[in-house]
Design a protein with these regions (language model features):
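Alpha-helical transmembrane bundle of multi-pass membrane proteins
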Residues: 1-174, 198-338
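Cytosol/matrix-facing amphipathic helices and coiled-coil assembly/linker segments
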Residues: 186-202
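Short intracellular "coupling" helices and adjacent cytoplasmic loop segments at the cytosolic face
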Residues: 175-188
């Protein structure tokens, strides 16, 4: 296994944490980059970082290089979490924007299905390729996406913001009106974008960041905006996903094959329920999905905790096994509001 060994304790925590640190740093830069130089450039940078990080990680001769590769992958994550959803919403047909943005989020699970089953297949490798190959294959989906992205136009909203109105008109006409540059929908969209940009510029000239805390309404909205991202990661999904093997260890599922099999099946399950949530977003509404998600996660997490505690006290195999279906139920709740 080389320097990797069996990650645990601080070493395991560092492998996971440095990824988030890289994402945190690049998220701030990504917003500026996508607004200043276009959504596509930011996406290209994200692709470049994930390719570099994958190669660096797979070829890492020691733990220091591997940790750096994880940070590089994290930088990529911050970029591709910022610009692509913007670009997708700005080129999608108006009636399809909600479901398009939701389907973008479940792309994570599409990649997770591949990675989990590749890891399952390489579990028997006696060499360091048992983890180097899955690390290298992080570049698979970005490579597959490159040909399609070469054909993807720049955001019409960004183009209009750069006074490249005719280029934006052609993009909207090609995507929304079968190439008709004079279509009423195209004219209306351009007008709406111009008005929105103008309003934003006027607002920026007469306001400051301090305005976000000056009124009760603004403070309430700021609180929701800030805490939504925090609580989405504090809902327990990180513990169950990043440390699934350790969770399973605590309930008596200790065989590597069984743990990886559960992980692979869980990612397929996540992909299915993430898709269901995306399809239901317009029919059921966002708030009902959020509330349903929170309720399902709360109840199932309480049950998981109770069963885990009972297993620790009694060592009852059926009690430990009962945790597994509730992990799946928990993630079904998480997925529908993703």
């Amino acid at each position: 296994m080389g320097f990797m060994g069996q990650p645990s304790g601080t070493w395991l925590g560092l492998i996971n944490a440095v990824y988030s640190l890289g994402a945190l740093v690049s998220t701030i830069f990504a917003a500026w980059c996508s607004n200043s130089f276009g959504r596509k450039l930011c996406v290209w940078l994200g692709i470049a970082f994930v390719l570099a990080g994958s190669i660096l990680g797979a070829a890492a001769p020691n733990d220091t290089v591997f940790i750096v590769s994880r940070a590089v992958i994290g930088v990529s994550s911050g970029m591709v979490s910022n610009a692509p959803p913007l670009l997708l919403n700005e080129i999608a047909y108006p009636a399809h924007r909600s479901i398009s943005s939701c389907l973008f989020m479940i792309g994570y699970y599409f990649g997770a299905v591949i990675s989990s089953w590749v890891t399952f297949a390489t579990r028997t490798y006696a060499s360091s390729w048992s983890w180097r190959l899955p690390t290298l294959l992080q570049m698979l989906c970005p490579l597959v996406a490159i040909p399609g992205f070469l054909l993807t136009p720049e955001s019409p909203r960004w183009l209009i913001g750069q006074n490249r109105v005719e280029e934006a008109r052609k993009v909207l006409a090609d995507l929304h009106a079968s190439g008709d540059l004079t279509a009423p929908l195209v004219t209306q969209e351009i007008h709406e974008i111009q008005e929105a940009i103008s309003a934003e510029k006027e607002s920026a000239a007469s306001s400051s960041y301090s305005d976000m805390i000056k009124t009760p309404g603004n403070r309430h909205r700021l609180l929701i905006t800030v805490t939504l991202g925090i609580f989405s990661q504090w809902s327990g999904n990180g513990v169950v996903s990043y440390y699934l093997a350790m969770v399973l260890d605590t309930v008596g599922v200790t065989a590597t094959k069984d743990q990886l099999l559960i992980s692979g099946c869980l990612q397929i399950w996540n992909l299915i329920f993430g898709t269901i949530g995306a399809v239901l977003v317009e029919r059921a509404g966002r708030r009902p999905l959020f509330l349903t998600s929170a309720g399902v996660m709360l109840v199932s997490y309480i049950i998981i905790t109770g069963l885990s505690g009972s297993f620790a006290s009694t060592g009852s195999a059926p009690t430990g096994t009962a945790v597994i279906p509730f992990i799946f139920i928990y993630f079904a709740g998480y997925d529908i509001a993703l």
